[in-house]
């Protein structure tokens, strides 16, 4: 996709999110995930290993969860 199409899709996702609708975004582009998300669930080997607030985490920390190097404490 070209940059214009990506920006359009992002704006539509954010608009839906801001209206209170659930939006599921599956992406390996961590900057994209951080930019458009208000909540991030990370799965590793079929299990949710983290429930993160993108305002309180870093791309590096997100990557560690994705790689299975880090897990949140059981809740």
Spell out what each predicted region is:
Residues 1-75:
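Glycine-rich phosphate-binding loops of nucleotide-dependent enzymes
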């Amino acid at each position: 996709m070209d940059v214009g199409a990506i920006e359009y899709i992002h704006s539509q996702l954010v608009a839906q999110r801001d209206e209170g609708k659930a939006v599921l975004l599956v992406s390996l582009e961590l900057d994209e995930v951080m930019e458009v998300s208000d909540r991030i669930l990370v799965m590793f080997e079929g299990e949710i290993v983290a429930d993160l607030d993108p305002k309180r985490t870093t791309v590096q920390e997100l990557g560690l969860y994705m790689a299975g190097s880090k897990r949140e404490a059981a809740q």
